[in-house]
From Swiss-Prot:
It comes from the Eukaryota. Partially overlaps MTW1. Residues 1-20 form the signal peptide. Keywords: Signal. It comes from Saccharomyces cerevisiae (strain ATCC 204508 / S288c) (Baker's yeast). This is Putative uncharacterized protein YAL034C-B.
C-alpha cells in the first residue's frame, strides 16, 4: 500500500424497498472518518466505528450514497451493497457509469470497502 490519508466524507443512507421508488424514503446522514489506502490495483476505504453503528441498523435492501468529492480520485460513488456505479467528477478519469464489484468486509470495529481502481 503506497499511501494513507484520513478524510471526512458525508454518508447518506436511503432506505428503500423492492416495491417502491427511492423518493420519499427516510434518510440517515452521518459524517464518517475514512482511511484511504492507495495500492497498486485497488483502493481500500477503512470505514471507522460510526459507520458500523449506522449500517448494522439498516435493512438488507438499502442504497448507500457516498459524496466523496474531497478525495483526490474518488468522486461521487453510488454503492448498492454489491455494486458501485462510478460517476465522472471534474478531475476524474473514470468512465461514466461503469460497473465494478464492491466488497464490504467487517473486521472488528471496522468495515473495509475494497474498490478496484
Amino acid at each position: 500500500m503506497a499511501a494513507v490519508h484520513l478524510y471526512i466524507i458525508s454518508f447518506t443512507a436511503l432506505m428503500i424497498s423492492s416495491t417502491s421508488e427511492m423518493g420519499g424514503y427516510p434518510k440517515c446522514s452521518v459524517n464518517i472518518e475514512v482511511d484511504l489506502i492507495v495500492g497498486a490495483d485497488m483502493v481500500v476505504l477503512i470505514v471507522l466505528t460510526q459507520f458500523q453503528r449506522v449500517i448494522t441498523q439498516l435493512p438488507n435492501k438499502c442504497q448507500l450514497i457516498f459524496n466523496a468529492s474531497y478525495l483526490p480520485f474518488l468522486f461521487t460513488r453510488t454503492i448498492k451493497i454489491s455494486k458501485v456505479e462510478r460517476q465522472q467528477g471534474e478531475r476524474s478519469k473514470m468512465a461514466m457509469k461503469s460497473k465494478i464489484e464492491l466488497k464490504l468486509i467487517h473486521k472488528g470495529s471496522h468495515f473495509y470497502i475494497q474498490l478496484p481502481i
